[in-house]
């Protein structure tokens, strides 16, 4: 039997079930097995590994994962795809499909039920564009014990995850992801290898979880508040952004100027020029003056 991710087999499956693509669910099926293999290769899935997939579609990536992993768990929100997955994944007894929205699911419960304690597990997925960021944040903030993520996403979002200070792509998303993970852009994927064809190109991004965050901060929540406030209006200075947008901090520009100067950061700089280390230093200094 041909792999699912060939143009003809995908077309046959879609026609057999009369499946219509829902734009609202970001359904674009990959029809290139070479790209799928690059994804699985970079996940470094071994015979004892587990994989979590989000949005398996008709099972193209799931199939490649099932050939290599000990266990694959796939979250699929669209009930119409369940009978299709029953057929396409029938040869693989190591796959469990869960008909739930991963954003609402108790992922820790699923993890403990489906995987062995201490098992090497990766999140491997062709993520729906419209929920890429919420999914990554949910799985990172809930501290799911996975080794990392190899995910396909909109190229523009991938560029933001990997961005360095001083670039137009660099922002609060870059800092949040790099705080938890090491980011690597594996490859750009042209829009032509999807059905239906999206309007943008994609990228495969690998995120390997750090043993501990890249910087030490006194208060994680406050650190991210400082970061978000610093990027509230990109063209404004740190001084203006922090004095107008940092909740729980005195509206005192003189105090803010003094703190910024003390930690060696020019108040006239913009947030996009600060490294993650500078943001950590700044938030650790600012929190000493936070209103209780």
UniProtKB/Swiss-Prot annotation:
MF-aspect GO terms: 16S rRNA (adenine(1518)-N(6)/adenine(1519)-N(6))-dimethyltransferase activity; RNA binding
Location in the cell: Cytoplasm
Record has Glycoprotein as a keyword: no
GO-annotated cellular components: cytosol
CDD domains, A to Z: AdoMet_MTases
Enzyme's top EC category: transferase
EC number: 2.1.1.182
Binding-site list for S-adenosyl-L-methionine: 28, 30, 55, 76, 101, 126
Catalyzed chemical reaction(s): adenosine(1518)/adenosine(1519) in 16S rRNA + 4 S-adenosyl-L-methionine = N(6)-dimethyladenosine(1518)/N(6)-dimethyladenosine(1519) in 16S rRNA + 4 S-adenosyl-L-homocysteine + 4 H(+)
Pfam families: RrnaAD (PF00398)
Keywords, ordered alphabetically: Cytoplasm, Methyltransferase, RNA-binding, rRNA processing, S-adenosyl-L-methionine, Transferase
Database matches in NCBIfam families: ksgA
Function, as annotated: Specifically dimethylates two adjacent adenosines (A1518 and A1519) in the loop of a conserved hairpin near the 3'-end of 16S rRNA in the 30S particle. May play a critical role in biogenesis of 30S subunits.
Family named by the database record: Belongs to the class I-like SAM-binding methyltransferase superfamily. rRNA adenine N(6)-methyltransferase family. RsmA subfamily.
HAMAP family assigned: 16SrRNA_methyltr_A
Protein name: Ribosomal RNA small subunit methyltransferase A
Organism taxonomic ancestry: Bacteria, Bacillati, Bacillota, Bacilli, Bacillales
């Amino acid at each position: 039997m041909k792999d699912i991710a060939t143009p003809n087999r995908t077309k046959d499956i879609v026609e057999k079930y009369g499946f219509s693509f829902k734009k609202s669910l970001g359904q674009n099926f990959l029809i290139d097995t070479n790209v799928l293999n690059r994804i699985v290769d970079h996940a470094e899935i071994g015979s004892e590994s587990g994989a979590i997939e989000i949005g398996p579609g008709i099972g193209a990536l799931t199939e490649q994962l099932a050939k290599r992993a000990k266990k694959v768990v796939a979250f699929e929100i669209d009930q119409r795809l369940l009978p299709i997955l029953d057929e396409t994944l029938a040869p693989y007894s190591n796959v469990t499909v869960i008909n739930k929205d991963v954003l609402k699911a108790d992922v820790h419960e699923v993890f403990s039920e489906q995987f062995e304690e201490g098992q090497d597990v990766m999140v491997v997925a062709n993520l729906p564009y419209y929920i890429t960021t919420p999914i990554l944040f949910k799985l990172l903030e809930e501290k799911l014990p996975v080794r990392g993520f190899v995910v396909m996403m909109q190229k523009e979002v991938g560029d933001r995850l990997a961005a360095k200070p001083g670039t137009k792509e660099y922002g609060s998303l870059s800092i949040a992801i790099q705080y938890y993970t090491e980011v690597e852009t594996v490859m750009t994927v042209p829009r032509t290898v999807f059905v239906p064809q999206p309007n943008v190109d994609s990228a495969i991004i690998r995120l390997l979880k750090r043993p501990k965050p890249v910087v030490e901060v006194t208060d994680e929540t406050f650190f991210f508040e400082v970061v978000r406030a610093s990027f509230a209006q990109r063209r404004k200075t740190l001084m203006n952004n922090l004095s107008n947008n940092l909740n729980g901090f005195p509206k005192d520009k003189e105090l803010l100027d003094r703190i910024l100067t003390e930690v060696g950061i020019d108040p006239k700089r913009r947030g996009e020029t600060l490294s993650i280390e500078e943001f950590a230093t700044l938030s650790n200094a600012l929190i000493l003056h936070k209103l209780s």
